Structures are given as structure tokens and as C-alpha cells.
A protein has these predicted regions:
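Mg2+-dependent prenyl diphosphate-binding active-site environment of isoprenoid biosynthetic enzymes
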Residues: 12, 16-278
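Charged C-terminal helix
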Residues: 280-283
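N-terminal amphipathic/basic leader segments beginning at the initiator methionine
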Residues: 1-13
Length: 283
């Protein structure tokens, strides 16, 4: 992913301004680490089928990272999770205040779509990428999931409701990453759907694993506050730690089976990523 890190560093959002902190606020969380999970999924699909398009696809990968970073900045705010640590660093609002953190998140959100619109891809592809990101990140996707999560804090949900919450809040943007890669390389609609559905299940596993890590890791190990999910509708809160681990095992085994049915180029491109993440809850 070194190529993506270089691309990111070369395309950090900036404005010509006399504001003393604005550009630092835009850039700090982007360069402050992170797994780059969503860009890696998208670029993995492109690398598998159309390696010559990888450079052009960097714009879409960056758009995903910008959008994801905006969501983290807002998620950390006092009105939401009220977190003071992210990726081992103080959260944006603790450094620059709530107002600038909100505005920085807003700027990264909108800049993601500017990056997509200006990418060196065909116009029909750009339009479809914008649609996928907006649909999965917005009204009926990530934003909806966050709204459900906040509204039902301290009010227990049923398992199917918790799944629906996290399908929206976490899984849809991960699924969108795979679908966007499929669109860039021109895969048929059936293959796009298979990758999207795989991404939904992968996103749910990712969330269960995060819930497990919240219950078992220290803030220093996780790089963010832990042990704060007791009032939230997490999988550990609902199923208990061992129940959540068993649920994660089931998802991981299902994903392994699905992954084996993909074409060889996809398996080869994403095998390392799957190996790193499918069973990380067992570490």
C-alpha cells in the first residue's frame, strides 16, 4: 500500500487560507495511521483484473479514505461517542475544538466526491462511483446506522436489529469498496453483487471483531478508548464475549467458503488481506 500512502500524501486536501489550524485539521487524521482497509479492498479488485487502471483508481480509493475519516471525526465528537483517543493520538475535537472538528469532517466528506468527480476515469464510471458511495455512506447507509446506534443507546435491541444497525453503520461502506472496484474494472452486475454481498458479511465480521477487541484490549493496545460499549448495542453486550467469538467464527467460516468460490484473480489479490482479518478475533 506504499503507492497509496504516497498518493494520499500528494493529494491531501488544502485551502489557501490565513486560518491557523484549518489545513492541519484536514490532514491530521488522514496521515495519522489507519488500516486503509477500504482502499485496499478497492485497489485489490482493480489490481486483480486491470493493473493498468490502478493509478486512476487511486482517486476512488482516496475518496473512500476521506469519507471514512470524516465518519471517524464525527463519531468521536462529544455528541456521539465522546472519544479522546483515535489511532493512538488525541481526537480532532480535543485538539481543535468541536466546531473545527465538525467542519473538518464536513470538508473531507464533500472533498471525497470532488476527488471522484475529477478522477481520470470514464464519466459513466465516475457517476456510478459517486452513486455507490453516496448510497452506502448516506441516507440509507452509514448515517442511518449511526442514527440508530445513538438513538437506542442504553435500550437493548434484538440480534436482528443489531445486525441491521451494523450492516448500515459499518458493513455497507466496506461492501461499497468492493463494488466500486468492480465498477472500475467493468465486472458484470452478477459479479458486482457477489462482491457487495461478500463485503456486507465481511463488514459485519469486522464489527463483531471490533466489539471483541473493545472488551479485551487496553486503550494503549487498541489506540482508542475501550471498555465503553456496555451501554451500546454491541455484539458482545448482546451475546457475551464467548457468544460474540462464536458468532465471529461462524461469519469467518462462511466468508472463507464464499471467498473460495471467487475467480482466481480475486482470490490471489485479496488472499493476504483475508488472512490478516478473517480470524483476528482469535489472536
Amino acid at each position: 500500500m506504499q503507492d497509496f500512502e504516497t498518493f494520499l500524501a500528494d493529494h491531501l486536501p488544502r485551502a489557501e487560507t490565513f486560518h491557523p489550524h484549518y489545513n492541519d485539521a484536514l490532514a491530521s487524521m488522514l496521515v495519522g495511521g489507519g488500516k486503509r482497509f477500504r482502499p485496499r479492498l478497492l485497489l485489490g479488485i482493480v489490481e486483480a483484473y486491470e493493473p493498468l487502471l490502478v493509478e486512476s483508481a487511486m482517486h476512488a480509493a482516496l475518496a473512500l479514505e476521506l469519507f471514512h475519516t470524516y465518519s471517524l471525526i464525527h463519531d468521536d465528537l462529544p455528541a456521539m461517542d465522546d472519544a479522546d483517543l483515535r489511532r493512538g493520538h488525541p481526537t480532532l475535537h480535543t485538539r481543535y475544538g468541536d466546531a473545527l472538528a465538525i467542519l473538518a469532517g464536513d470538508a473531507l466528506n464533500t472533498h471525497a466526491f470532488e476527488i471522484l468527480a475529477e478522477s481520470p476515469l470514464r464519466s459513466d464510471v465516475r457517476i456510478e462511483l459517486v452513486r455507490i458511495l453516496a448510497r452506502n455512506g448516506g441516507t440509507g447507509g452509514m448515517v442511518l446506522g449511526q442514527a440508530i446506534d445513538l438513538h437506542f443507546e442504553k435500550r437493548p435491541l434484538k440480534l436482528e436489529q443489531v445486525i441491521e444497525l451494523h450492516r448500515n453503520k459499518t458493513a455497507k461502506l466496506i461492501a461499497a469498496s468492493l463494488e466500486m472496484g468492480a465498477v472500475i474494472v467493468g465486472l458484470e452486475r452478477e459479479s458486482r453483487k457477489a462482491l457487495y454481498d461478500f463485503g456486507i458479511e465481511l463488514g459485519l465480521l469486522f464489527q463483531v471483531q471490533d466489539d471483541i477487541l473493545d472488551a479485551t484490549q487496553s486503550p494503549e493496545e487498541a489506540g482508542k478508548p475501550t471498555g465503553h460499549d456496555g451501554d451500546k448495542n454491541s455484539f458482545v453486550t448482546l451475546l457475551g464475549l464467548e457468544g460474540a467469538r462464536a458468532y465471529a467464527d461462524g461469519l469467518a467460516e462462511s466468508l472463507e467458503e464464499r471467498f473460495g468460490s471467487f475467480d482466481a484473480p480475486i482470490r490471489e489479490a485479496l488472499e493476504g488481506l483475508m488472512r490478516d482479518y478473517l480470524f483476528r478475533h482469535r489472536d
